[in-house]
């Protein structure tokens, strides 16, 4: 009897270390990503205090890095690079993903990172709308209640900013109406992207690296074309060649963005979407706190209440979902089956 207990203990310890790896990977990469994107878009470079204005160039660099790494992962695992789904479906995800990321970067010119991060929590509503339209999903009353509370908390956070914002990076740049409009575009496009990705995974038997590779490859082509058509490619290259610290920031941003993609995929595959949602909620809270400290963003008491409403609702939803999931799940499989799942 001692041997099975020893085996089960080893499995639990292995799962624990995988959890530590997943949490530390997601938290570190995405928190660094958040700080870097705010620095690039809101902090001036050089003695002349010039701002980096070419958000599409950031999208291109991020997607180029991710597509190269995902191609390397496919080749290293000796898997074919042939597309599993029709190419136009990858392109559709790419277009909405580019629009999502561009709105995200552009919004940082007009609203602070804490406002943007908390507003991202309101993506539940567009996801529910797109899920109903595209996948004919049905949601319960509790889901709508959580979505309403999160939206309410986000609205309070945006509408009641601190009156004595001492951040030197906000002066003359705040425009709540335009910033909120860009965030609304971000939420709409992001909701469609995630819902259509879900539909693509369920409709085709594809590896995560396959979807990442073709989606980011299409994004590279589209963003590069957009830079040329807008005439922003050479100005962006001139800016980063003149300001080497900006080039370093963009390189690091692309690196952590790529790393976060694979940590996210690993976490969802190993622990499921519910655990991933709880980790992401914690990451958003940590990002807001770090941004407030790093870039001197004060929070009003109304914003603190809004934050409590948002994160309290999200944690309550995750807790209830985990409880419901544990009650409906069958007993854990024996060790040979567990090893088979982990190696797939």
From Swiss-Prot:
<feature type="transmembrane region" description="Helical">
    <location>
        <begin position="292"/>
        <end position="312"/>
    </location>
</feature>
<keyword id="KW-0762">Sugar transport</keyword>
<keyword id="KW-0472">Membrane</keyword>
<protein>
    <recommendedName>
        <fullName>UDP-galactose/UDP-glucose transporter 5B</fullName>
    </recommendedName>
</protein>
<dbReference type="Pfam" id="PF08449">
    <property type="entry name" value="UAA"/>
</dbReference>
<comment type="similarity">
    <text>Belongs to the nucleotide-sugar transporter family. UDP-galactose:UMP antiporter (TC 2.A.7.11) subfamily.</text>
</comment>
<feature type="transmembrane region" description="Helical">
    <location>
        <begin position="142"/>
        <end position="162"/>
    </location>
</feature>
<feature type="transmembrane region" description="Helical">
    <location>
        <begin position="220"/>
        <end position="240"/>
    </location>
</feature>
<comment type="function">
    <text>Sugar transporter involved in the transport of nucleotide-sugars from cytoplasm into the Golgi and/or the endoplasmic reticulum.</text>
</comment>
<dbReference type="GO" id="GO:0016020">
    <property type="term" value="C:membrane"/>
</dbReference>
<keyword id="KW-0812">Transmembrane</keyword>
<dbReference type="GO" id="GO:0015297">
    <property type="term" value="F:antiporter activity"/>
</dbReference>
<keyword id="KW-0813">Transport</keyword>
<keyword id="KW-1133">Transmembrane helix</keyword>
<keyword id="KW-0050">Antiport</keyword>
<dbReference type="InterPro" id="IPR013657">
    <property type="entry name" value="SCL35B1-4/HUT1"/>
</dbReference>
<feature type="transmembrane region" description="Helical">
    <location>
        <begin position="56"/>
        <end position="76"/>
    </location>
</feature>
<feature type="transmembrane region" description="Helical">
    <location>
        <begin position="115"/>
        <end position="135"/>
    </location>
</feature>
<feature type="region of interest" description="Disordered">
    <location>
        <begin position="324"/>
        <end position="344"/>
    </location>
</feature>
<feature type="transmembrane region" description="Helical">
    <location>
        <begin position="176"/>
        <end position="196"/>
    </location>
</feature>
<feature type="transmembrane region" description="Helical">
    <location>
        <begin position="16"/>
        <end position="36"/>
    </location>
</feature>
<feature type="transmembrane region" description="Helical">
    <location>
        <begin position="246"/>
        <end position="266"/>
    </location>
</feature>
